């Protein structure tokens, strides 16, 4: 059975830290592939700046030539509010799935709609600084223990890259060198995004 990592996000825009995390997950967790899942309308976030079509195309450009990385447009195709539970329920049953989280997402995981069902459908891998403690919220820790499940640690040193910083730089006309794949930077410039 294939092992597939799932990395959800707004990808507004996709940047080098997203790609580094996906590559690290594929290698460290021995995944057959990692799917980047752009959100249609994330319920816990501010409105997105780039259209779904632009965000999807930027991901396609960013992962071109990386066979272990793929884009899964399931949330864009569904439209409306984006809930992870709907996404995991729509996944084909012929693979084992690992949902990739950051420590910030882990801290508020129990606020996600039907979080227990999500944790029952997929394994949870948390990108954490090597050597840093990995602490699940008490409610999640209790649920995991009761269901004989555990968090998977994904050693990953955080990178000082954020989509909001990139959008700010682009709006000011500042450099984004070292933050975006070159193909994505060219696409953004060609389409005048984030100005």
From Swiss-Prot:
What pathway is it annotated to? Cofactor biosynthesis; NAD(+) biosynthesis; deamido-NAD(+) from nicotinate D-ribonucleotide: step 1/1
Q: Work out whether the entry's keyword set contains Nucleotidyltransferase.
A: yes
GO-annotated molecular function? ATP binding; nicotinate-nucleotide adenylyltransferase activity
Q: What is its EC number?
A: 2.7.7.18
> Pfam families from the entry?
CTP_transf_like
> Which superkingdom?
Bacteria
Catalytic activity field = nicotinate beta-D-ribonucleotide + ATP + H(+) = deamido-NAD(+) + diphosphate
GO terms under biological process:
NAD biosynthetic process
Keyword annotations: ATP-binding, NAD, Nucleotide-binding, Nucleotidyltransferase, Pyridine nucleotide biosynthesis, Transferase
Q: Which family does it belong to?
A: Belongs to the NadD family.
Question: What function is annotated for this protein?
Answer: Catalyzes the reversible adenylation of nicotinate mononucleotide (NaMN) to nicotinic acid adenine dinucleotide (NaAD).
Q: Which protein is depicted?
A: Probable nicotinate-nucleotide adenylyltransferase
Q: What's the encoding gene here?
A: nadD
